[in-house]
Design a protein with these regions (language model features):
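Divalent cation-coordinating acidic motifs and surrounding scaffolds
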Residues: 11-15, 23
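Residue-level recognition of the N-termini of beta-strands and the immediately preceding loop/turn
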Residues: 80-84, 114-119
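Short secondary-structure boundary/capping segments
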Residues: 14-18, 100-103, 134-138
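Short, conserved catalytic/metal-binding motifs centered on acidic residues
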Residues: 1-2, 46, 89, 129
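Electropositive, glycine- and tryptophan-enriched low-complexity nucleic-acid-binding patches
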Residues: 23-87, 92
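RNase H-like two-metal-ion nuclease catalytic core shared by retroviral integrases
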Residues: 96, 119-139
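Short, surface-exposed basic-aromatic patches at helix termini and helix-loop junctions that form
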Residues: 100-114
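Active-site- or DNA-interface-adjacent structural scaffold in DNA-acting proteins
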Residues: 1-12
């Protein structure tokens, strides 16, 4: 599971760069629309679940994404899972010492009735997280 930096939308989504001819706009007001992607990769089934939020990358957004993923599973799939294992980078919004994140995860464990195991990669090693290979589709 991982969240990425803000993704701009519209004419400025790639810093204004394009591979083809593009007619320039009359005025350059910049892009005000942006979204924050948060993704979850199920390694057993190779299914990618991506949510886009319009707010900041926070611990609440991460837990809300995980909750939406769980609710989207069928009852049979939920029953087949004995524990949820999350491989995460050690970012500030999902750190194991951040009380808001741990409190929300505790409530989620109580809600779903399954243990959640948080596995953190050391600093500067998030490239080994399998979800990192999926972010190229946003470019």
């Amino acid at each position: 599971m991982d969240c990425k930096a803000t993704v701009k939308l519209g004419a400025f989504s790639r810093d204004g760069k394009t591979r083809g001819d593009y007619k320039a706009s009359d005025h350059d007001f910049g892009s005000t629309e942006h979204y924050v992607p948060c993704g979850l990769l199920e390694e057993d089934t190779a299914q990618l679940y991506v949510t886009f939020g319009s707010s900041a990358k926070t611990s609440d957004f991460i837990v809300d994404t995980l909750t939406a993923w769980w609710q989207g599973l069928s009852a049979k799939a939920q029953g087949a899972i004995d524990r949820v294992q999350l491989k995460m980078d050690n970012g500030p919004e999902s750190s194991g010492v951040r009380t808001q994140f741990l409190q929300r995860m505790g409530h989620l464990v109580d809600t779903i009735g399954k243990p959640i195991q948080l596995r953190y990669y050391p600093p500067y090693h998030s490239k080994y997280n399998p979800i990192e290979r999926c972010w190229g589709i946003l470019e």
